[in-house]
Design a protein with these regions (language model features):
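Membrane-interface transmembrane helices that cradle and orient dolichyl/undecaprenyl
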Residues: 230-243
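Membrane-interface alpha helices of multi-pass inner-membrane proteins
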Residues: 242-267
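Transmembrane-helix signature of polytopic, membrane-embedded enzymes
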Residues: 186-209, 227-228
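Extracytoplasmic catalytic/substrate-binding loops of multi-pass membrane glycan-assembly enzymes
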Residues: 114-136, 140-160
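Hydrophobic, aromatic-rich transmembrane alpha-helices
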Residues: 182-187, 331-355
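Loop-to-helix entry region of an early transmembrane alpha helix in multi-pass inner-membrane enzymes
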Residues: 151, 155-184, 216
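Short acidic/glycine- and proline-prone juxtamembrane loop motifs at membrane-interface regions
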Residues: 214-223
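Perimembrane helix-loop-helix junctions
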Residues: 260-289
Length: 405
């Protein structure tokens, strides 16, 4: 089997896996009670095929999008419209213009979000009380409350929040800076994957319109430190590969939820245009890092081994929770299925389209897997910030066509 054929098989395998979890998520938008009826504890008064309030809108918009997409792919649209689309997809910004545009976008974002730093977080989120008690005990105190102790087991996060609280006198400062950097690295990763600055700008705009991202961008109790560290671990694969596992372990000790994400990092490295020797080095470094982290968790004094409890029915119900948590991100809900299908077509010319599919797959399936294997956690909206980032990068990839293609 040739290398090209093998590459296409990988692309199709990745696409099928991602399509499966996306369809499970979309199904719960159309039929919100379907999974609860068959897998939930209280199904007596449920109508499994009752349409959700977004169902008709979702189906109609997807029919329109797919119809237009097929017509464009088959060259069946009017020539003037095809010409406009091609000009947009091949358009590029100069480096200086990109810096100005990005500065304006970030300036508007920071300006509109800064007033949120003055809001008392204890009046916003009930979970802040747990964080407040954990900070009082940090770094040497212990608690019988599993929720408080879990906070203090996230060492990197607590150090950063402690610095923000005690040095900057505002616990929201560093979480907000982290969110700004998440936007910046969304641009950098898109530009790296697509080799187009315009694609990076598109991704930034898509991320900044996401309700879930804007809802949690200044929140300390649901900070984005872990998202930032994971994005840096992806970005450094092609820049300074030896830093990738370092930032991954920082992400892990910021939020253990990121633990399985290393598989996505390794796949991204596999699809990257780097030498085989470097790929082996990255794999080896991650094996060492993961082994050390597992040893610390199971042989150290952390709560994580004590919260494991397997309940397979919660896995399917997890997809229902995803659609519920992201119901206000209308653009994501409408576009996630078309983007998934479109990325497999883009993967013919850009292997990083496969990487984005894997990142979307992992970001979706991580939450159902988490609730299936533990009793301590439930599915929260802030955990989907990485999904929105990778979705935004996926959108950007449609604007990465080179003139020669």
């Amino acid at each position: 089997m040739s290398e090209i054929e093998n590459s296409r098989l990988v692309s199709y395998a990745v696409f099928i896996c991602t399509l499966a979890v996306v369809l499970l998520t979309v199904t719960t938008i159309i039929f919100p009670a379907l999974f609860s009826y068959y897998f939930g504890l209280y199904s007596e008064n449920l109508e499994p095929f009752e349409l959700g309030y977004q169902a008709v809108f979702l189906v109609i918009t997807n029919i329109v999008i797919f119809s237009f997409g097929i017509a464009y792919y088959k060259k069946k649209i009017p020539s003037f419209l095809d010409s406009i689309i091609e000009k947009i997809r091949t358009f590029e910004l100069s480096k200086n213009v990109t810096i100005i545009v990005l500065a304006i976008i970030l300036g508007i974002y920071v300006g509109l979000s800064t007033p949120e730093l003055l809001i008392d977080e204890s009046t916003q989120w009930g979970d802040y009380d747990v964080l407040d008690r954990a900070l009082e005990l940090w770094p040497y105190g212990e608690s019988d409350d599993v929720y408080v102790q879990e906070q203090n087991d996230r060492y990197v996060r607590m150090i950063l929040l402690d610095v923000s609280h005690n040095i900057f006198q505002n616990i929201k400062i560093l979480p907000f800076i982290a969110s700004i950097l998440v936007v910046a690295f969304t641009f950098l990763i898109t530009t790296q994957f697509c080799q187009k600055r315009f694609a990076g700008i598109i991704s930034v705009i898509v991320l900044l319109q996401a309700n879930t991202f804007l809802k949690f961008d200044t929140i300390a109790v649901y900070e984005n430190f872990w998202v930032l560290f994971f994005l840096i671990s992806l970005y450094t694969i092609q820049r300074k590969w030896f830093l990738s596992p370092v930032f991954y372990i920082l992400a892990f000790f910021t939020k253990a939820y990121v633990a399985p994400f290393f598989l996505m990092t390794l796949f991204t490295a596999y699809r990257s245009e780097i030498s085989r020797r470097r790929k082996v080095a990255i794999l080896s470094s991650y094996i060492i890092i993961i082994a050390a982290a597992v040893a610390l968790i199971f042989f150290g004094e952390t709560i994580y081994p004590d919260v494991i409890e397997i309940n397979s029915s919660k896995f399917i119900l997890g997809f229902q929770a995803i659609s519920s948590q992201l119901r206000f991100d209308i653009f994501f809900i409408v576009m996630i299925l078309p983007v998934t299908v479109g990325l497999v077509l883009l993967s013919k010319n850009n292997k990083h389209a496969d990487s984005i599919l894997v990142l979307i797959f992992g970001s979706i399936i991580a939450s159902p897997a988490l609730v299936m294997f533990t009793f301590h956690y439930d599915i929260q909206a802030y955990r989907f910030v990485p999904l929105l980032v990778f979705f935004a990068i996926g959108i950007g990839m449609f604007f990465s066509k080179k003139v020669s293609e």
